[in-house]
UniProtKB/Swiss-Prot annotation:
PANTHER family, sorted: RIBOSOMAL PROTEIN S19P FAMILY MEMBER, SMALL RIBOSOMAL SUBUNIT PROTEIN US19M
Family: Belongs to the universal ribosomal protein uS19 family.
Protein name from the UniProt record: Small ribosomal subunit protein uS19c
Keyword RNA-binding: yes
Gene this chain is encoded by: rps19
Species assigned in the record: Cycas taitungensis
Record-level GO cellular component terms: chloroplast; mitochondrial small ribosomal subunit
Length: 92
């Protein structure tokens, strides 16, 4: 179910403060965050945000098409693995 339009989008306060300070100074730095649930807002466009995937921080460059999505959508947590091969030669 989608979030109510009466409410504002969730953005972690510390991340939003860092982005606003960088926008005022006109700087571009990598912002490290563990907040995967934060919604991407227009103030983030053009910044690189390193999102934690459970093991490491993955740098993500924010574009205008990402606005409205969550940061966690762009940092996959699972590695797709296939099934083990049932090769009879490897058993011998």
């Amino acid at each position: 179910m989608a979030r109510s339009l009466k409410k504002n989008p969730f953005v972690a306060n510390h991340s939003l403060r860092k982005i606003e300070n960088l926008n005022i100074k006109k700087e571009k730095k990598i912002i490290v965050t563990w907040s995967r649930a934060s919604t991407i807002v227009p103030a983030m466009i053009g910044h690189t945000i390193a999102v934690h995937n459970g093991k490491e921080h993955l740098p993500i460059y924010i574009t205008d098409r990402m606005v409205g999505h969550k940061l966690g959508e762009f940092a996959p947590t699972l590695i797709p693995r296939g099934h083990a091969k049932s090769d009879n030669r490897s058993r011998r």
